[in-house]
Structures are given as C-alpha cells and as structure tokens.
C-alpha cells in the first residue's frame, strides 16, 4: 500500500509562531490551551514549563501570561493588563484581523454577522469587540426573520469553509442595502482544505490527524469523508487500526493546523508497520 501526504497540511504560520513564543517565554501560563493539540500542549508543559489555565481567574503567582492563538475577549485582555503580570500575546495575526474589523465596523454603525461556532474561543473573542448588534451563525437559515439595519458587515471564523461563507454573503446581499464582506478565512485553511479534497478523491482510505477539539481539523475530516468514505480522524498513532488498511492501495494523510510533524511521522511509521 502506498502512503501519500496531502500537498498542504499541518502547522500553519500562526501555530508555529505561537509555539516559538511559548518556548522562548518558558515558565509561563497560557490563558486557555495555546493550540488545539493535547500532545503538543503536554510537550510544552514538560519541556518548557508552560502550563495551561482555563481563564484569567486562575492566575495566581504567575509572572508571565501567554494569550492563546485563538485570542481572548476584549474584557479579559483589559483585566489582564491591570495586573503586574507580563502579558505575551500569541494571538494569530489572522485572528486579530476579524477582531479589528468587528470593532471598526460596529463603531461605524454596522450590524455584524460572524460565520462561525459561537462556542469556539476565537469567535467569543471576535464577538467581544462588537459594540452594537452582532449575530453568530453557522448557516444562513439562522438569519431568517432578523431585521438588520441598512448596513451589515460579514466576517468569518478563520477555519471555516469558503463555500459556506459565500452562501451567507449571498443571502445578506439579497436582503440588505449595504453589505461589507471581509474574507477572514486564512490562506492555510483554504490550502489545506483544497489539498485534502484533491487527495481524498483518489485515496482508498484517508487519515486526518489532529485534536478532536480542533475546528480546522474537523473541517478537514468532513471534507475528506465527503470524497472518501473510509476517512478517520485521530489524535495519535495509538488510535490507528490495522483493519482500516486491508485491501487498500492508497492511504492519504492530512493533518490539522495544530498538528506537529513529529506526531504525523509517528502515524506514518505505525501505518507502515502493518
């Protein structure tokens, strides 16, 4: 059986940047998981003493606090800056962008629509920058019956599917006088999604590696599943099962933006042993 990696996969710019920041900081606490990958979080804790807190209320004797790649809410950031703790911002620049757009458009009198998961930390952070009306949706049907003002701004969670984002944009344009559409889906997300789609079309079995709580990894898995029925989402090599590969000729592999190369290689090694 041949194993083929997607043409684009794994660590994105924002994650690489955040990990380097955490490694350089050392002896610090992150506000929420730095990235959505438990294996890498454990490595940072073991090798660099970077521990994970659930919120700013858990800060006690820490001298350094790292803001996670997904960002935090505007109010939490303000509270954090009131303390004597050194604040190290590892928010991905692609996440900072919709935060700023949300704040600017809201202040300019626009209603704001965010395409994303309202329970995701990135979306919670972006939403907190709106001073006026803001709506978080995963589907245009959720906007039915909403009475917008004359002006609406649309942004997206950075890891969502472009096709769905455009459906929501089209829905708004048919119903609102002025719509400002800001494509805040990051390039790495788009490239990884296109790559997994192209590989899944040819593969007999697909393995998508990443955190089960990772939005971008889930999107990759769903795209893969759409084109290759035998698609599996795993976090580590320990979940790989021999039966998945019986009678298969091509195994495709993709990985989420928070998945390091060392985890991917362990999965490849495990599959090659079958």
Swiss-Prot record:
Protein keywords: 4Fe-4S, Iron, Iron-sulfur, Isoprene biosynthesis, Metal-binding, Oxidoreductase
Annotated positions binding isopentenyl diphosphate: 36, 70, 120, 214-216, 258
EC annotation from Swiss-Prot or TrEMBL: 1.17.7.4
GO molecular function: 4 iron, 4 sulfur cluster binding; 4-hydroxy-3-methylbut-2-enyl diphosphate reductase activity; metal ion binding
Catalytic activity: isopentenyl diphosphate + 2 oxidized [2Fe-2S]-[ferredoxin] + H2O = (2E)-4-hydroxy-3-methylbut-2-enyl diphosphate + 2 reduced [2Fe-2S]-[ferredoxin] + 2 H(+); dimethylallyl diphosphate + 2 oxidized [2Fe-2S]-[ferredoxin] + H2O = (2E)-4-hydroxy-3-methylbut-2-enyl diphosphate + 2 reduced [2Fe-2S]-[ferredoxin] + 2 H(+)
Cofactor(s) needed for function: [4Fe-4S] cluster
Keyword Iron among UniProt keywords: yes
Annotated binding of [4Fe-4S] cluster, by residue: 12, 92, 186
Annotated binding of dimethylallyl diphosphate, by residue: 36, 70, 120, 214-216, 258
Residues the record lists as binding (2E)-4-hydroxy-3-methylbut-2-enyl diphosphate: 36, 70, 120, 158, 214-216, 258
Pathway listed: Isoprenoid biosynthesis; dimethylallyl diphosphate biosynthesis; dimethylallyl diphosphate from (2E)-4-hydroxy-3-methylbutenyl diphosphate: step 1/1; Isoprenoid biosynthesis; isopentenyl diphosphate biosynthesis via DXP pathway; isopentenyl diphosphate from 1-deoxy-D-xylulose 5-phosphate: step 6/6
Source organism superkingdom: Bacteria
Matches recorded under InterPro entries: LytB/IspH
Cofactor: record remark: Binds 1 [4Fe-4S] cluster per subunit.
Entry annotation: catalytic residues: 122
A GO BP annotation: terpenoid biosynthetic process
PANTHER family: 4-HYDROXY-3-METHYLBUT-2-ENYL DIPHOSPHATE REDUCTASE
Function: Catalyzes the conversion of 1-hydroxy-2-methyl-2-(E)-butenyl 4-diphosphate (HMBPP) into a mixture of isopentenyl diphosphate (IPP) and dimethylallyl diphosphate (DMAPP). Acts in the terminal step of the DOXP/MEP pathway for isoprenoid precursor biosynthesis.
Family: Belongs to the IspH family.
NCBIfam families listed in its UniProt record: ispH_lytB, PRK01045.1-1
Listed name of the protein: 4-hydroxy-3-methylbut-2-enyl diphosphate reductase
Gene: ispH
